[in-house]
Amino acid sequence: MNVISHNVANVQTPGFKAQRLHSADLVASGGEGAGVVTLAIDHSLASGPIIETGQWSNIAINGTGYFAVQSPYDGKIYYTRNGSFHLDSHGFLVNDQGYRLLNTQGNPIPALDTSSYSSFRIDDQGHIWGIRPDGTTQDLGNDHQIGIATFSSESGLVSEGGTLYAPSAQSGPADIGQPGSGGRGLLISGFVEGSNVSIEEEMVGMVLAKAAYEANAKVITTADEMNKALIDIKT
């Protein structure tokens, strides 16, 4: 139920990947059922819906890959499908936690010059363009090209909470490059990828979990009653 509750709570979280519980039935030596054990909790790799926001700094990945973001506090790099970025007070593209978006070289994208440009746009290959007050545009260069990370086995990524992931021995290291290259997806500016949680599936799971709990509780109650009856017979 905890997994289901967590999924439902994040149905509106951009880039959130539904958690999936894998369990197995335990069987006692006599062949009787002995309950259920949790084997693992992983996440669904299915893409969520692409949702328009109209904000140029919001980005969705149309295809394979993850954004790379770096914590300015400890320098640790995380990977995410959540493209809800914005400019911070210093002009850096950051997520809601203040983690800076990385470029194709794996470095934080330099601060954008908001004094020279009235706005910006991002093309499908991750190039950031400055828009001057007179409407003319300027490609800000390779240092400002958004990178996309891929992994040899993305199912091996480890959840770091929310929509952030870290690589593991199973996933392999991140391979950061240009959007649209090496099987990486292209970018869509002004959109975000929504949560891939299906409310319908979670409600079905909740009903089944409740039914299983009630059935197990009934079995325990019946077993207790039978044991009590046997004790009464012996006495």
Language model features: what each stretch is:
Residues 1-106, 112-235:
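Amphipathic alpha-helical polymerization modules
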